[in-house]
Structures are given as structure tokens and as C-alpha cells.
Amino acid sequence: MKTKMSFGEALEVLKQGMQVYRSGWNGKNMFLFLKSSDALASDFGFGFGEYINEPVFGNIIFIKTADNKIHAWVPSQTDVLAEDWDIVS
């Protein structure tokens, strides 16, 4: 598999269900993963049309941090322009 990807290439890898990270990140064991809207709705017990005003979920990219927490992730300009993205093996 190709390593040292651009952010655009890393996004495509996320869409395929794999996890990615930047070799330039300081924290150990940090990586991104994509959770689909269908999976999120199912996790929260929605998506079946059972409730009035049932929320609609969108796809979300999450980060697993060095201190073992999961957060929604928003890229910095540095992340977007980086060419050091890699696939978690």
C-alpha cells in the first residue's frame, strides 16, 4: 500500500474504512477514523423513522488521542497541506 499520502488521499482511505495518522503528530497512537451517518444513527438508536423530529446524522471524522480519548476532529491548515499521512497497520 502507498504510504506518505496527501490529505486528499488520506480522506479516500478513511472512506474505505481504514484508519490514518500523520507521522508528524507528536502523540503516540493517535489516528483518525470515519464513522458513517448510518452507523452513528444506529449507535444512538435512531435512523428507523420511529421518532418525530428524529435527528439526521452526517459522517464524522474522529480522532483517537494520545491520552486514549475519542473526539470529533477538524483539520488544521497544516494537516490539510501535509504530505506525511499514513495508514494504520
Swiss-Prot record:
UniProt GO MF annotations: metal ion binding
Binding site residues for 3'cADPR: 25-26, 73, 79
The answer to whether UniProt assigns keyword Membrane to this entry is no
Tell me which UniProt keywords the record has, alphabetically: Metal-binding
Question: Is Signal one of the keywords UniProt gives this record?
Answer: no
Its function, per the record, reads: Counteracts the host Thoeris antiviral defense system. Probably acts by binding and sequestering cyclic ADP-D-ribose signal molecules produced upon viral infection (3'cADPR or 2'cADPR); sequestration prevents the signal from activating the ThsA of the Thoeris antiviral defense system.
Q: What is this protein called?
A: Thoeris anti-defense 2
Organism of derivation: Bacillus phage SP01
